[in-house]
Regions:
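Proline-threonine-serine-rich low-complexity tracts
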Residues: 1-190
């Protein structure tokens, strides 16, 4: 474009006239301007000059917007966490730059039982330093299992077997727990 623009200047008249300019190289592709002076020399009169400016507009600044940090509850399936994580990754956006491209250092979703993954997104552009932003995807830790065992139990002798069986069953069922993900209680009592 610059070369073609330089060649648009013309002149007429003069004796043995010739035209030159101080155009040199074009301004930077990422933005800038250059004032060029053309000079016509002729053997019959003083030099005649004119000037014009060639401008390349500045590249639009890169604007990078990361997704907000996101927290997911524990005890979901790993597939559900992976799906939520992958959707979250797509919530990044950017604009501006020249020949801009975006990448990230994603290493995968955190475990469904709890953890966090920090992702850094980077936009590279021909006309400015890399722009980066970070966000964190967290899965809350699964609640700790708290097991309360049955208390020792002593039964009097000479009861019927069905009474002992009923007391034993009730005693086995007196063990309780809280927490965990999809937790279940079992015992070796038979």
């Amino acid at each position: 474009s610059y070369s073609a623009w330089l060649s648009t200047t013309s002149f007429t008249g003069g004796c043995n006239a010739s035209m030159s300019n101080n155009g040199g190289s074009a301004p930077p592709a990422c933005g800038g301007s250059k004032t060029v002076t053309w000079t016509v020399t002729s053997t019959c009169e003083p030099n005649v000059t004119c000037s014009a400016v060639f401008t390349v507009t500045a590249a639009p600044a890169v604007v990078l917007t990361c997704p907000a940090n996101q927290t997911e509850a524990a005890c979901q399936t790993q597939t559900a966490i992976n799906n939520a994580f992958n959707t979250w990754l797509t919530n990044v956006s950017f604009s501006g730059g020249c020949n801009a491209a975006i990448s990230n250092n994603n290493t995968g979703a955190p475990p469904a039982c709890g953890g966090a993954t920090t992702v850094t997104w980077t936009v590279t552009s021909s006309c400015e330093p890399n722009k980066t932003c970070q966000a964190v995807f967290t899965v809350t830790n699964a609640p700790t299992v708290v097991l309360t065992c049955a208390s020792n139990n002593t039964q009097a002798a000479c009861q019927t077997q069905s009474a002992i069986d009923a007391a034993y069953s009730a005693w086995l069922n007196s063990a309780t727990f809280t927490g965990g993900c999809n937790a279940a209680i079992s015992n070796t009592g038979g």
